Amino acid sequence: MRPVSWLFSGLARARRRRLQNRFQGRAFKAPVAVIGNISLGGSGKTPTIIALVKSLAARGIKAGVVSRGYGGRARRFPLEVKFDTDVTLCGDEPKLLALELSSLGCPIVVAPDRLMAVEYLLALTDVDIVLSDDGLQHYSMHRDLEIVLIDGARGLGNGRTLPAGPLREPVERLLEVDLVLINGQADIPGVRADGRIGLQPRLFRHLASNKTVAADNWRESRVVHGVAAIGNPERFAASLQSLGLEVLLHGRDDHKVLSPGDLEYADQLPVIITAKDAVKLGGPIPDNLWVLDVEMVLEPSFVDEFIAKAGLVAMDTGADRSAVNDTQD
């Protein structure tokens, strides 16, 4: 597989250079920051964007967000996503973004062509910066900043590109990006860490009644089913295990709509899902179904460095500068 991986790496480099040379001069009226990764699987992009938007808002900076809207079936794109937009039109991650950020007045636009999404958003409203949820390899879109997220637990795998490894681009691509953000506290050999993010379990939410229980006060059962249709189900299981729970993990394909068969088990133990999966649920809600809400925390020093590299000016709003959200991807 290694010769094929070398060929893939060479093609990825050639494509990047060709598109960068073609589109590098097509800047927008506001800076664009792409938040993505160079490896397959979930690394926490969506919750990181939510946390970053909140941190920027606390500093008086208004951000907008664009996304591909994977899974959305709207008849016409670009589509502005609001808190009451049907999830089937926009996809699960944009819906979650809208639920978390609508109170801040953060515009969210989806389109299969992210370039079109950025142009539509900037014609729709004025923002100080546009954040692109993924799109690191979408080189036809001009970007002023590139932020790469890496899951600390998985690192970069064997360091090889597809199909011999998990990487979409060669490791040396990290030398070209502006900031590297690691999800977790693990050190990755040969990779700099410009900042770290971390998920902290906050509370359990009973979907049928909307009752909440603080994460450290969970008394329902020590053994639970964890069901997650996200890019990295193991990270979700780790969040539950950090609370002392024994997790029967049921990972599903990313973006899958959970069916009754995914949520019903003969033992009637509590079933816990992610907030990303909860936005897609329809029909009757089982009485033993819960959502784990987590807090994503960004280091203030990373946010300050991001603002400086983007050429933005922060204002002292007197607001709390810690950014949290209740998502997990």
Question: Which residues fall in each region the model found?
Answer:
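ATP-dependent carboxylate-amine ligase
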Residues: 58-62, 139-329
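Residue-level signal for inorganic ion chemistry
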Residues: 7, 46, 97, 133, ...
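Charged, amphipathic alpha-helical linker segments immediately N-terminal to NTP-binding catalytic cores
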Residues: 1-10
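Phosphate/Mg2+-binding loops and adjacent switch elements
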Residues: 69-191
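Walker A (P-loop) phosphate-binding motif
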Residues: 16-83, 326
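Phosphate- and divalent-cation-binding pockets in alpha/beta enzyme and binding domains
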Residues: 42, 116-120, 235-236, 280-281
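Hydrophobic alpha-helical packing residues
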Residues: 52, 56-57, 97, 101, ...
